[in-house]
């Protein structure tokens, strides 16, 4: 970007997060500088401070870190709740990985991740819980405004667009992947 005009190298902050096929993978790709900061200065010291490290304690620390991550964005319960939802989602992801020795089909795991992330972003962007519930209820047709939305031509066009976006997102490289092959960009992770 424009920082390169002044020979300033900024760390990569996003790496196609909507290509993620798990919530763990999403946070490895999304807001990478914040995730790194939280890992280095909150998660790791919290784990090191434990006398006995257990899976349950580590999962509780993950939840705590993501609540802090939420409040890092602003002093609002909505941000804290967003962090709680992501912390709980990560815990479920870790428990699933620990208990089951198989992976879901890529498209299914991508769809679950994409849906979960976007539903939780509603809590991040709305002013209060009532507004968040209203948005969600309108999305799923749980009120008079959304009645019959699943039978309209627009609904099927939307589904087609989502499928096209998934294909583009999955098959094509992002700008960093495209331009990193040029010598000027090498080593600028």
Question: Where would I find each of the regions flagged by the language model?
Answer:
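Membrane-embedded transmembrane alpha-helical bundles that form the catalytic cores
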Residues: 1-165, 169-189
């Amino acid at each position: 970007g424009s920082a390169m005009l002044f020979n300033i190298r900024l760390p990569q902050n996003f790496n196609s997060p909507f290509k993620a096929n798990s919530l763990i993978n999403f946070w490895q790709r999304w807001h990478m500088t914040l995730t790194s900061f939280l890992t280095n200065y909150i998660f790791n010291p919290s784990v090191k401070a434990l006398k006995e490290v257990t899976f349950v304690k580590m999962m509780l620390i993950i939840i705590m870190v993501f609540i802090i991550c939420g409040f890092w964005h602003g002093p609002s319960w909505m941000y804290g709740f967003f962090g709680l939802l992501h912390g709980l989602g990560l815990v479920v992801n870790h428990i699933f990985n620990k208990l089951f020795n198989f992976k879901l089909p890529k498209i299914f795991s991508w769809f679950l991740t994409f849906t979960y992330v976007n539903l939780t972003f509603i809590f991040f962007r709305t002013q209060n819980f009532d507004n968040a519930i209203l948005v969600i209820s309108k999305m799923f047709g749980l009120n008079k405004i959304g009645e019959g939305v699943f039978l309209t031509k627009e609904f099927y066009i939307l589904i087609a667009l989502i499928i096209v976006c998934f294909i583009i997102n999955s098959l094509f490289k992002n700008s960093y992947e495209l331009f990193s092959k040029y010598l000027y960009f090498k080593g600028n992770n």
